[in-house]
């Protein structure tokens, strides 16, 4: 039986390295990544096209037909690949700000995406005759695979048909994919073309074929087919092909948050190297920011179960009506979480319409994505304070008194500084903001919280490789102490080289049975928020 160690309020049972930071002052190659972002989709990808429900998403839900669990978590290191995977939609549009928070500024190094949903795969069934079929099962499961056509033209999802070949008596199989990327609440398309203008792509076409066996052999060996479908057949191999009119993919289903899917996501991602979560409530309306089934569960996870110290960005209110208040407001969200691992962002960007017909208001999640993406592209110790965001107009401009109250309430917001809209201060939702570092080690400053998290991650990742699974003779207290001191020294800032720490001291190691407990003191590389210049004016003399 494994011993249970209570470490900083967590029950540690499995072998491994664990780390925490407390505020209790006393008289190597860094391996951890920073800035990886995760989106747990709770229905943001759903849309309606031509009166039919669809979805702009790829892969399978966490409870999928073809994949489940961690295999349903998808990773991307650039926006183009993510957009191609999603096929458009609101999530695809928001993600641009995660990778490129503003023009010329790099954002998150990686984006992880998963649907907290149960999905079944859509299928295209080409029937040659009774009992003789060729079936394409969509790997993009759920509603996303279902074909939707307008006047016979595929707009989203998949379809296939069999057309006459070049030689007499031969036929070609064509696989078709819609290219429409959806539209926002104002009816403006996310992509370059409207629903009426969009035309489908023939993503692959076979050579001349004559029988079911030949069609199946082509399908299982075609790279495009393999990337998009599982292929099966029924019937006699010698069945002759024939022309078949366009057949839409059908039968794909997506059900979000129905049967423990959110918990399954959290279980699947436990070992992933993540820094930020972008919560998928659009704003503070209807209590979505504090939904116990989504954001509430995520908060419990990052506080109790996550391997690393991760952070949530929660979209808050949009204007003056939902800035303060006991419910459905940025203030109520901040009070609910009250943690330095949670950020609530207030403010709805206003942008020009693509058709040039005035402006439109975007939901707060766009600003949250932009700020989070900007933070993800910087070093952990770099504060968000006075960093320019990628928007230049907002639904409501906070007055000075409101900005001051918002900072005290733990609400991150923007402010116009010398003609540019910037983050006023990189604050967390921690309500105990009388001092920069609270007695429990939490901080009102996001950059300090991220410093803590990054130090912990560095120690965990390298510590478990060096020591876990060795014997006490191989991993002596002296070697553990030397490693910790070397690691901390590598994280100290020096002239011309910024880093996580200003200084460290007092590394101590104690052992009990097969467990080592390492303590150390450090001074984080804190942000500079205010500068006060006092001039001493002198009399003119000569």
Give each language-model segment a name.
Residues 482-486, 518-520:
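A generic structural signal for well-ordered alpha-helical surface patches
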Residues 470-474:
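A short beta-alpha structural unit
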Residues 497-542:
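Compositionally biased, low-complexity/repeat regions
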Residues 2-469, 480, 487-492, 501:
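A glycine- and small-residue-enriched flexible loop/hinge signal that marks low-structured segments
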Residues 1-2, 542:
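Short, solvent-exposed mixed-charge patches
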């Amino acid at each position: 039986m494994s011993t249970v160690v209570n470490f900083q309020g967590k029950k540690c049972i499995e072998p491994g390295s664990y780390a925490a930071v407390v505020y209790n002052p006393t008289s190597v190659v860094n391996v951890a990544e920073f800035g990886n972002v995760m989106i747990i989709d709770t229905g943001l990808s759903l849309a309606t096209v031509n009166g039919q429900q669809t979805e702009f998403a790829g892969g399978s839900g966490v409870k999928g037909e073809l994949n489940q669990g961690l295999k349903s978590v998808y990773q991307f290191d650039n926006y183009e690949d993510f957009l191609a995977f999603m096929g458009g939609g609101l999530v695809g549009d928001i993600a641009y700000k995660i990778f490129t928070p503003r023009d010329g500024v790099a954002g998150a190094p990686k984006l992880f995406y998963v649907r907290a949903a149960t999905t079944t795969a859509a299928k295209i069934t080409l029937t040659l005759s009774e009992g003789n079929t060729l079936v394409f099962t969509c790997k993009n499961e759920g509603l996303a695979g279902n074909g939707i056509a307008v006047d016979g033209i595929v707009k989203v999802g998949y379809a296939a048909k069999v057309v006459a070949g070049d030689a007499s008596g031969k036929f070609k199989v064509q696989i078709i994919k819609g290219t429409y990327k959806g539209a926002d609440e104002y009816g403006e398309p996310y992509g370059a073309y409207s629903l009426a203008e969009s035309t489908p792509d023939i993503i692959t076409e076979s050579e001349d074929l004559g029988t079911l066996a030949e069609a199946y052999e082509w399908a299982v060996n075609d790279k495009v087919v393999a990337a998009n479908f599982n292929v099966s057949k029924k019937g006699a191999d010698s069945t002759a092909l024939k022309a078949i009119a366009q057949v839409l993919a059908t039968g794909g289903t997506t059900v979000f948050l129905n049967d423990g899917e959110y918990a399954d996501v959290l279980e699947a991602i436990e070992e992933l190297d993540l820094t930020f979560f972008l919560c998928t409530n659009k704003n503070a309306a209807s209590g979505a920011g504090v939904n116990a089934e989504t954001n509430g569960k995520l908060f419990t996870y990052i506080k109790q179960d996550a391997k690393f110290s991760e952070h949530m960005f929660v979209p808050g209110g949009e204007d003056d009506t939902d800035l303060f208040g006991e419910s459905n407001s940025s203030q109520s969200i901040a009070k609910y979480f009250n943690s330095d691992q949670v950020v609530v962002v207030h403010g709805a960007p206003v942008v020009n319409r693509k058709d040039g017909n005035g402006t439109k208001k975007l939901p707060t999640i766009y600003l949250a994505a932009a700020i989070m993406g900007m933070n993800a592209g910087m070093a952990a110790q770099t504060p968000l304070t006075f960093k320019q965001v990628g928007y230049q107009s907002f639904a409501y401009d906070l007055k000075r008194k409101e900005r001051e109250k918002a900072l005290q309430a733990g609400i991150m917001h923007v402010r116009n500084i010398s003609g540019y809209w910037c983050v006023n201060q990189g604050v967390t939702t921690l309500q105990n903001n009388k001092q920069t570092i609270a007695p429990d080690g939490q901080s009102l400053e996001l950059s300090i919280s991220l410093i803590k998290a990054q130090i912990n991650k560095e120690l965990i990742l390298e510590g478990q490789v060096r020591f876990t699974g060795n014997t006490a003779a191989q991993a002596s207290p002296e070697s553990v102490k030397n490693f910790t001191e070397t690691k901390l020294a590598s994280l100290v800032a020096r002239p011309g080289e910024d880093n996580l720490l200003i200084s460290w001291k007092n590394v101590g190691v104690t052992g009990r049975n097969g467990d080592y407990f390492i303590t150390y003191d450090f001074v984080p590389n804190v942000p500079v928020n205010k500068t006060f210049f006092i001039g001493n004016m002198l009399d003119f003399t000569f």
